[in-house]
Every structure is written in C-alpha cells, then in structure tokens.
Design a protein with these regions (language model features):
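Short aromatic-glycine-(Arg/Gly/Cys) micro-motifs in beta-strand/loop hairpins
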Residues: 4-12
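Amphipathic, hydrophobic secondary-structure cores in small proteins
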Residues: 13, 17-65
Length: 91
C-alpha cells in the first residue's frame, strides 16, 4: 500500500498598497480567528504600505481562498498575495 503524503503548511505574505487596507485586513484576520503576524513588508515586495500580514496555509489555493473569503472591500482591492519563500506573486 502507498503512503499518504500530507502537505506541510506554507507561509504566505499579504502586502498592501495602503495602511488603511492593511489595518482592515488585520481586523478581518482577527475576526476570523486566524493565526498571523503583522510584519514589515519585505524589501523584495513592491508595495505602497510598509506593513504586511504573514500567515500559513496548506498551499496556494487554500491561501487564496482564505484571503478571498476573509478580506473584503478596499482591503481586498489593495492587497497582493505572495508566497513567503521567494516572494512569488499569487494574486
């Protein structure tokens, strides 16, 4: 019988073009009970705001779905999702 592979959680960074959007997303993450860290936006990421949210998910699809379900309005409009390793842009 084959072994079942369990995906390990990956880290993602949600960067913003405005401080207002970052604060709104932070409130949305808190309301959803999500585990996250407010971090300085990495230099490798070009964003108008110096704050980003770092969180873990089982993969890019899960991270994108979580952000789409949790972050709304202007916060979603001015947010960009990246993988934390290599800062590959996802949305």
């Amino acid at each position: 019988m084959g072994e079942t592979q369990v995906a390990s959680a990956q880290s993602f960074v949600l960067a913003f073009d405005s401080t207002h959007a970052a604060m709104a997303a932070q409130a949305a993450f808190k309301a959803a009970g999500a585990s996250f860290a407010l971090i300085p936006t990495p230099r490798e990421i070009s964003a108008g705001c110096g704050m980003s949210l770092k969180f873990k998910a089982e993969g890019a699809a899960e991270a994108q779905a979580f952000v789409a379900d949790t972050v709304t309005g202007d916060a979603a409009k001015y947010a960009t999702l990246y993988e934390a390793t290599g800062y590959t842009k996802l949305s």
